[in-house]
C-alpha cells in the first residue's frame, strides 16, 4: 500500500542514479510506481496493520498485492520536511526545511525556526521525479504539495503533470468549485475525493 511505493521508489532512485549514461528502460520492463504519502496517519491506523477502528479496504488491497514497508521512520514530525526528504533523499536539516511552510507564525513567533530555514524546496535539489524522468518515466503529482509557492510547484520539480495543488498545499475546500490552481470541471455538490 502506502509503503509499497516507497520501496519501489527507492529501488528506482538507485537505478536512475546509475543509469545516467545508459539508454532508457524498455517500456515493458518498467514497473508502475504509485507512491502514497499521507499526513497524520499512524502505521496502526490502517486495517492491514491491525486497526479495528478504521476500515481501509482499498489501501489493504494495495498492500496485499504489493510489498509492505515495515522498517522505517518519518524524517520529520510534520508534512513539508517529510515530503522534501522523501522527494530528495536528504534529511530536513540538510535541506534547511525543518518545519511545515509558514509554520509557527503568530501567536507562536517566539518559537519560529532559525533564519536559515527555507520556506520552499529549492530547484537545485534533484527530486525522485527528475531521476525517474531520466530513465523514461512520466510523472504525475496529485494532492497536497506544501513545498513552496507557484514558482516551486511540482511541475518545476520534475513532475510532468500536477493536479489539485495550491501554495498552502490543500485545495481549500473539497466541494465544487475547488479554488485550486488547475481547476477541474464539476457541478455544485461534487466532492473532490469522489472524482
Range-by-range predicted roles:
Residues 2-9, 14-195:
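Formylglycine-dependent sulfatase
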